[in-house]
Swiss-Prot record:
Function: IGPS catalyzes the conversion of PRFAR and glutamine to IGP, AICAR and glutamate. The HisF subunit catalyzes the cyclization activity that produces IGP and AICAR from PRFAR using the ammonia provided by the HisH subunit.
CDD domains the record matches: HisF
Organism: Cupriavidus metallidurans (strain ATCC 43123 / DSM 2839 / NBRC 102507 / CH34)
Annotated catalytic residues: D11, D130
GO cellular component, one term: cytoplasm
GO molecular function, one term: lyase activity
Name listed for the protein in its UniProt record: Imidazole glycerol phosphate synthase subunit HisF
Keywords (A to Z) from UniProt: Amino-acid biosynthesis, Cytoplasm, Histidine biosynthesis, Lyase
Gene3D superfamilies with a match to the protein in the record: Aldolase class I
Catalytic activity: 5-[(5-phospho-1-deoxy-D-ribulos-1-ylimino)methylamino]-1-(5-phospho-beta-D-ribosyl)imidazole-4-carboxamide + L-glutamine = D-erythro-1-(imidazol-4-yl)glycerol 3-phosphate + 5-amino-1-(5-phospho-beta-D-ribosyl)imidazole-4-carboxamide + L-glutamate + H(+)
Compartment(s): Cytoplasm
Enzyme class: lyase
Amino acid sequence: MLAKRIIPCLDVTNGRVVKGVNFVELRDAGDPVEIARRYDEQGADEITFLDITATSDGRDLILHIIEAVASQVFIPLTVGGGVRTVEDVRRLLNAGADKISVNSSAIANPQLVSDATGKYGSQCIVVAIDAKRSSAPGEPPRWEVFTHGGRKATGLDAVEWAREMARRGAGEILLTSMDRDGTKSGFDLELTRAVSDAVPVPVIASGGVGGLQDLADGIRLGHADAVLAASIFHYGEHTVGEAKAFMAREGIPVRM
């Protein structure tokens, strides 16, 4: 089994790291450069930056933040938020990003994923999917894709959309459960497993981590290849090193 990754996520708005619950009630968590440096020192495998209001606010890319982080942090950086064109992908890669995450723009223009992967390779294009359970109790499970920071329903089925994005060349799927985001009640394992089992590319589980066991469950029960978390790391409940040590004790291969 390949080593599983632990990825701290920095949600950024107005130049600050924030964390909310169910995509709202945002709380300040600090300076992005300082926080990224701390996670690098703790042994994070990667860091993900998401400008969570860039698309809905119509703002430009967070190039200055990525340049500052890339000059001080030496692990892979994934960056998303406000990416609308292949030119935006180029600008972020030049600023120091290693992978680019697209979400709302992929739904508005699926060809963007095909074009970006054609030019820069699948390994640097991540498709982020924000999904919310839409099936009633007793019905077969179904999840709908949302965009614009969880504000806009699309009518798309999350599992089918993940399949389509993988067909178009996406190298990874970053899958967030909107129902679990910030709740600390654990990943939506049914959602994570449904998508992980449906696509041939790695799936990063996101949304709901409340403790170290949740990280292990995302890998073992959700079939994810990587786990992403924010609150438990930002507010000092656990370090990345503690998370890796726990995973290793659980028999999950990690890079120590």
